[in-house]
Amino acid sequence: MINNRMKKHGMTAYRTRATFLLPMALSLIICHLSLSPARAQRQLSSVPVGSVKWTGGFWGERFDVLSKTSLQSMWETWQTKEGKGFNNFLIASGEMQGEHHGPPFHDGDMYKWLEAVAAVYAINKDPELERIMDRFIGCVVKAQREDGYIHTPVIIAELNKKKKEQQDGNDDTVVGTATGTKKDKAFGNRLNFETYNLGHLITAGIVHKRATGKTTLFDAAVKAADFLYDFCQRAPEELAGNAICPSHYMAVAEMYRETGNKKYLELLKQFIDIRGMVENGTDDNQDRIPFRQQYNAMGHAVRANYLYAGVADLYLESGEEQLMKNLTSIWKDIVTRKMYINGACGALYDGTSPDGTNYTPDSIQKVHQSYGRPYQLPHSTAHNETCANIGNLFFNWRMLEATGDAKYADIVENCLYNSILCGISLDGEKYFYTNPLRMSDELPYTLRWPKERTKYISCFCCPPNTLRTLCEAQNYAYAISKDAIYVNLFGENTFTFKPDGKNEMTLAQHTQYPWDNKVLLEVVKAKKAVNTVIKLRIPGWCREVNVSVNGCPVPYDREKGYIAVNGKWKKGDVITYSMEMRTRIVEANPLVEESRGQVAVQRGPIIYCAESPDLGDIDIDDIAIPVDTKFTPVEVVIDGSRMIALEGEVVVRDEETWKGQLYREVSRKNERRTIRLIPYYAWGNRGKSEMTVWMPAVY
């Protein structure tokens, strides 16, 4: 009766663990004996590491800051009194003595930083970066167990235990040493984040190999992946409960691509299958029910988006149609009901799950840093963890690879320019953990995370994740198919590749995007003319485009948000691509109560905000924007970074204080004033400030 009611109202019928545990176990046995042949469904492929290089412009400036300041600054942070991440590896490798310090996921955070260093090294071949990587990798290799397991809290505790037992004359137990174990304690507590750490080790090892040609870290990554495989075969249910922020899903998918070993693809499928084996699963961790029964985004936004990216990887390599049904439904739920205008995800700091709570009060669960109900998108209390926004990028990139549809590339671009770039200061040394749409000093409560950018946060997952994502942003600029080159992002860069598999060609983009609407795509190197199709993305915010080749307008086809330009390309050929880039006044769906009657401002891919340093005596609460306001682009410099701000006339309402009132009669006192809006990613770089993206509309 209850299940019928739930189906009638479009709700998921929650099965008990007993109803699916046996079939799930049987499916795992079958999967282990014979994995069905993969039917890859990839439409696009990523470009090789190092094949795209920023040469100037917006992303060239950001890459310079990241490569010359951010990486070294974070390396120093890892060795400070607060950070101590590197000290943990020194102790675990036997180079020094001591106790573990910091959260259990610090290992994974250091691996993310290492991945960022490797990505930069692939571009600039800086010997100092190579030296730093070699120093850290040496500790990782020495700390890793022979069976591939590595988790510095466990390794350090066991080394210290062994030392004490030797001192006491009782050398009976050695758990987690290089010689093996008598009792495997791995994955005893899901909040130890062991699979998260191992996943980032595997990914870092692959990127390091591709960037340097060395296999020192890659060999450790293979051992870690093999450890996960072996453990999953003997204790799948135990491993099922240890998939918090499942970076290991994407990691083993990439290991399969790197090695061609199908056991890693088998392992990825098992990871998704065993999620249904979790006893007392939660919506917060997306494991209350099996994944293939999930059609809406739920729970902790980082965990969710990493899960969706990992499942998309499985679809790319297996072609399982059911997975695409789940992913398409979840994507639509996010983009049309749960995503912020800046591409950010995860509206709630803390709350209760909107799923599975009907009819049975005992089933109500807590959630944190999570998706909320549809259209629940608060401004000041938006959590929007940078890691969740990065996960949104990962998910959409894989959906782009699966479909070749530019709507996914639109979100990749939105996240990069707005909700991810906002996570790091312009000088490259300070970070936000959360990314609200509004910051006001008037709120009478304290939120969990700092209102100012800071160099070190106790929960340090976002800073290195931001670094690696931005250091690898060039890899999203292009994608390739069997017969075309896809141009997804615009910026000053060069891209060297072999369109026909034999003859090398180098394309160069010349542009001041995102501030200017024109992009020149030049063939700067080609040994011989090559027939291929170049596909240029039409941004979702753009109404009109123009394209010409060598100064002459050319016919083109539109398909899935791309312009297809056919040609036999030779050195010196130039495509000129212009996109309409006007300032847009944007409103939200009226079901978003927090944004009703308000508007935001966007120009190109950039979301704008009002920040107190630009407002003088104007309070952010008193600004209203006439919907017919004409904003003028003006060049400004904030903390050494050039950008385009917008200036326009707005209505400034009466400045009377509320004096503790909750309601009062509307005041019609107002005046017209000209104010400046800055890019959202740049706020918070001039000290503590107030800020808002959404402002009341005047119609």
Segments the model singles out, each with a brief description of its role:
Residues 316-337, 377-429:
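Catalytic-core region of carbohydrate-active enzymes that cleave or remodel glycosidic bonds
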Residues 21-34:
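Bacterial N-terminal signal peptides
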Residues 39-109, 134-174:
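Low-complexity, Ser/Thr/Pro/Gly-enriched N-terminal "stalk/linker" regions
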Residues 146-147, 193-210, 217-257, 300-301, ...:
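Aromatic-lined, polymer-binding surfaces characteristic
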Residues 327, 409-418, 423-525, 558, ...:
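C-terminal beta-rich recognition modules with glycine/proline-rich loops and embedded aromatic residues
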Residues 542-566, 585-591:
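Solvent-exposed beta-strand/loop surfaces of large extracellular or lumenal domains
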Residues 41-44, 93-110, 126, 163-165, ...:
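Solvent-exposed loop and edge beta-strand segments that line ligand/cofactor-binding
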Residues 51, 57-61, 65, 112-127, ...:
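Well-ordered alpha-helical scaffold segments within catalytic/enzyme domains
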